A protein has these predicted regions:
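Short alpha-helical transmembrane segments in multi-pass integral membrane proteins
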Residues: 1-25, 82-149, 191-247, 304-369, ...
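N-terminal transmembrane alpha-helices
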Residues: 9-49, 62-77, 81, 106-113, ...
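Residue-level signal for transmembrane alpha-helical positions in Major Facilitator Superfamily
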Residues: 19, 34-35, 74, 115-119, ...
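Interfacial/gating helices of multi-pass transporter permease domains
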Residues: 20, 43-65, 132-136, 196-197, ...
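Transmembrane helical elements of multi-pass membrane transporters/channels
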Residues: 20-39, 143, 177, 206-210, ...
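Helix-terminus/linker motif at the lipid-water interface of multi-pass membrane proteins
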Residues: 30, 34-55, 124-131, 187-194, ...
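Small-residue-rich hydrophobic transmembrane alpha-helices
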Residues: 54-114, 151-170, 264, 278-336, ...
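Short runs within selected transmembrane alpha-helices of multi-pass transporters and secretion channels
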Residues: 75, 144-162, 170-178, 199-212, ...
């Protein structure tokens, strides 16, 4: 089985192989997104409190993103290293990476659970919570935080299944959890009357099932690389390269948290709870664009990394071209949808007429440049697949830290409608970041391939 997977990666037709890995990865990303979207859809329609509760849950997003950031520090850093080691025929090294990564995820879970549980109320105030929305944010957040170990294991260990070529198994991890979440949400939120607490409990339970599924597979007979007890002890020489490569994804997600704080605090200042509520809806919708793109890149990563490790330059190039075409095509279709029917999309998340109206105009502004994001993510993630941690990190910082976050605070000073200025920062940064990232990638791509995997 292992030999067949390696043969497919190194010699099978590239496009069918990519689709075989990308489709389950995209489905997994979309299904994983349902954990939060389904919660928000149900919460937004709770009679009498829907808009306030939805806004409160949205304010918890920065903490949720930080949890995901620590998970992907390990998953996004370890999976490419594992694939490169496997491509070079070093199975023992690949299994050491998996074992060390698992231990680090458990360590992060303990530290983050203690810190975020104690600091949740103060942090949520800082993010822009009002007296009306804080109770819902705390109620949802503290339960979610208590289950963070399952969140980190699912997000952090699932890439190690995908990178071995078991994309369908990886997809089932999120499908199983999402189905359980969808079933439990209405029962706990409405049936038992638990409200936002019910949504959090449903999410934690579904993530726990997903974590058990992953551990069963990685310790079972079907996997190529096993999670072994003898490799759980952390070794500096093993974990530091993982952290070095994963820091790019960590920065991407942690700055996403900082970005969310910047948006929510600015909008709370200029527009109050309704503006923050609109941003909650817009953020959920925008993830329907960005996460499938990341799924495409996640599916392409094992093929690019393996063939880079094996020194097969032409196959790496073919994989990248196909990945870029899919990413740009998807973002173009998504952009057309957002420009055409933003009000219909907003109505899925809330029945509050005022919130729908506000979200409709805000969404058109925010999404105006999103078609360019496909180019930026495809290029930036390809740097990761090729082991180029420093360049990938710089590009991860570019859009959010260097461009978007400053623009959120600068642009409102140049327009009469301050909230318009806040939302306008997004498309401006999207277009600038995509242009710079594409130029950087295409000027370096051939040089990286010529150097080969030995210097990754």
């Amino acid at each position: 089985m292992a030999a067949q997977n390696r043969q497919d990666m190194g010699s099978g037709p590239v496009k069918p192989l990519l689709l075989q890995l990308m489709i389950p990865a995209v489905v997994a990303q979309v299904v994983n997104l349902l954990y939060n979207i389904v919660d928000r859809i149900y919460i937004g329609h709770i009679e009498g409190i829907g808009a306030a509760a939805l806004t409160g849950v949205g304010l918890f997003a920065p903490i949720l993103m930080l949890l995901n950031a620590f998970a992907m520090l390990i998953g996004a850093g370890g999976a490419p290293r594992t694939a490169i080691a496997l491509g070079q025929g070093n199975k023992e090294d690949a299994e050491k990476i998996i074992g060390n990564s698992f231990t680090m995820l458990l360590f992060f879970a303990v530290v983050l659970t203690i810190g975020f549980y104690a600091g949740a109320p103060a942090l949520l105030r800082l993010f822009g919570a009002s007296d009306a929305t804080l109770p819902y944010a705390v109620a949802y957040g503290r339960i979610y935080i208590l289950g963070s170990v399952f969140v980190l294991l699912v997000m952090g260990m699932n890439p190690f299944i995908t990178t071995q070529g078991f994309a369908k198994i990886s997809m089932l991890t999120t499908v199983i959890g999402a189905v359980i979440n969808i079933i439990l949400d209405p029962i706990l939120i409405f049936g038992l009357g638990w409200g936002v607490r019910g949504a959090a409990v449903a999410t934690v339970l579904s993530q726990a099932v997903g974590a058990c599924w992953i551990l069963k597979f990685l310790t079972g007979p079907k996997t190529i690389l096993k999670l072994r007890k003898e490799y759980l002890r952390v070794e500096r020489g093993v974990i530091l390269p993982v952290l070095g490569l994963g820091i790019s994804s960590f920065v991407m997600l942690s700055t996403e948290s900082l970005l969310s704080i910047s948006f929510s605090s600015s909008l709370a200042c200029y527009g109050g709870d309704i503006a923050v509520g609109a941003m909650t809806v817009i953020t959920s919708v925008s993830q329907l664009c960005t996460l499938p793109i990341q799924g495409i890149c996640q599916g392409g990563q094992p093929v690019m990394s393996f063939n880079f490790g094996a020194g097969k330059k032409a196959r790496v190039k073919e994989a990248f071209r196909f990945q870029l075409t899919l990413c740009f095509g998807y973002t173009t279709l998504f952009w057309l949808l957002m420009m055409a029917v933003p009000g219909v999309v907003a109505g899925i998340f809330t029945s509050d007429a005022a919130l729908i109206d506000y979200t409709t105009w805000a969404m058109r502004i925010y999404m105006a440049g999103i078609l360019a994001m496909g180019v930026q993510i495809a290029c930036q993630q390809s740097f990761m697949a090729l082991g180029q941690a420093k360049v990938s990190l710089l590009l991860a910082c570019l859009r959010k830290i260097i461009l978007l976050i400053p623009l959120i605070f600068i642009l409102p000073h140049f327009v009469a409608d301050k909230c318009f200025g806040v939302f306008l920062a997004e498309p401006v940064s999207d277009l600038l970041a995509a242009t710079i990232t594409a130029i950087t990638f295409f000027s370096r791509f051939d040089k990286i391939l010529d150097r080969g995997a030995g210097r990754a």
